[in-house]
């Protein structure tokens, strides 16, 4: 999981979700996992 200042979708399977006030990217590819803040 990487922490980024800005998160966006990398591929078609990436999904942006909000958990506990943080924006996360969930994807079938583990390399695409990241959160904001």
Curated annotation (Swiss-Prot):
The keyword Protein biosynthesis does not apply. Keywords: Chloroplast, Plastid, Ribonucleoprotein, Ribosomal protein. It is found in: Plastid, Chloroplast. GO terms for cellular component: chloroplast; ribonucleoprotein complex; ribosome. One of its GO terms (molecular function) is structural constituent of ribosome. Disulfide bonds: none annotated. GO terms for biological process: translation. Belongs to the bacterial ribosomal protein bL36 family. This is Large ribosomal subunit protein bL36c. It comes from Jasminum nudiflorum. The gene is rpl36.
